[in-house]
């Protein structure tokens, strides 16, 4: 009997080790699907004009308010389910892959300026048929969400800006200092060696990743390298669109959430933003980097839930 018990314990461990080593894509996809399931979100596609968009949706329910999630540069809709799972089933949850990201179409002949991305996001939201919604955007997605709330306010009930882009912060973040010094963009990977550098910049507490999972993550990221290089040029220099000019035009309630240790977009951005907003709520998460929804999913969800329910 003792041998049987040992075998029952050892065999699943051995099986997982083999799968992890020889089928990391399966492990990666299984983890992603588990997060979606925990959040009650299912994958969908929708054709809007000439482009196909992928999105996650927990399902229409007229008795629940809707939250629209907008991811950042080089990211995707699946950055959100871990956080969304802590929202307790009180909302309809819709996370959209922006054009050029995730499983949505990836054209190279369009503009990826924030204003262009905002207009495309609006068309997707209209096509899905959302009557009104709360919006949360991270990084580049926060820049998009802020501009959306300022320019297309009719259906926006509130907006949460999560470590958002679009602000010329008083203190320059480490990533921008590095790029100014000639180092490569830490958000764009060129080899598996860049994975550790990526997480050093994005998180305080790095996720555990086996060598095979790390290699698979790098493979997925490197496949997007050329497109990400192209998109990034629309977010800087002459293409930069200053969100500070939009903030005074936001009429919906605004919440700002930032990781205290963000190395991509500095927390001092709040010093610029707060005077331009009325009655904004500010949450600074200690020991947190650029991706609070992944590094601190429960705390980020609780801040969002508390904010929405206070309105």
For each predicted feature, which ranges?
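Conserved alpha/beta-hydrolase catalytic His-Asp/Glu region
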Residues: 23-30, 170-178, 188-249
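Flexible "cap/lid" loop of the alpha/beta hydrolase fold
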Residues: 150-151, 157-190
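Catalytic active-site module of serine/aspartate enzymes centered on a nucleophile-bearing elbow/loop
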Residues: 280, 287-311
């Amino acid at each position: 009997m003792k041998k049987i018990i040992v075998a029952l314990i050892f065999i699943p461990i051995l099986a997982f080790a083999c799968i992890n080593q020889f089928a990391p894509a399966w492990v990666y996809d299984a983890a992603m699907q588990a997060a979606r399931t925990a959040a009650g979100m299912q994958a969908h596609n929708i054709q809007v004009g000439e482009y196909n968009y992928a999105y996650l949706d927990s399902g229409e329910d007229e008795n629940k308010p809707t939250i629209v999630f907008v991811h950042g540069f080089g990211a995707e809709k699946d950055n959100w389910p871990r956080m969304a799972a802590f929202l307790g089933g009180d909302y309809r949850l819709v996370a959209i892959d922006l054009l050029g990201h995730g499983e949505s179409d990836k054209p190279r002949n369009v503009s990826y300026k924030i204003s262009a991305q905002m207009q495309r996001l609006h068309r997707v939201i209209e096509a899905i048929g959302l009557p009104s919604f709360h919006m949360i955007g991270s990084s580049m997605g926060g820049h998009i969400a802020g501009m959306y709330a300022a320019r297309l306010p009719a259906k926006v009930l509130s907006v949460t800006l999560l470590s958002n882009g679009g602000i010329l912060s008083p203190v320059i973040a480490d990533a921008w200092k590095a790029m100014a010094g000639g180092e490569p963009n830490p958000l764009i990977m060129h080899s598996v060696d860049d994975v550790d550098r990526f997480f050093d910049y994005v998180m305080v507490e790095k996720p555990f990743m086996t060598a095979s999972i790390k290699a698979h993550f790098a493979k997925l990221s490197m496949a997007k390298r050329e497109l990400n290089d192209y998109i990034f040029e629309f977010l800087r220099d002459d293409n930069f669109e200053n969100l500070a000019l939009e903030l005074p035009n936001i009429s919906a309630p605004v919440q700002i959430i930032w990781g205290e240790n963000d190395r991509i977009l500095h927390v001092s951005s709040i010093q610029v933003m707060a005077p331009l907003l009325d009655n904004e709520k500010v949450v600074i998460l200690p020991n947190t980097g650029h991706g609070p929804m992944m590094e601190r999913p429960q705390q980020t969800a609780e801040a969002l839930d508390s904010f929405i329910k206070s309105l």
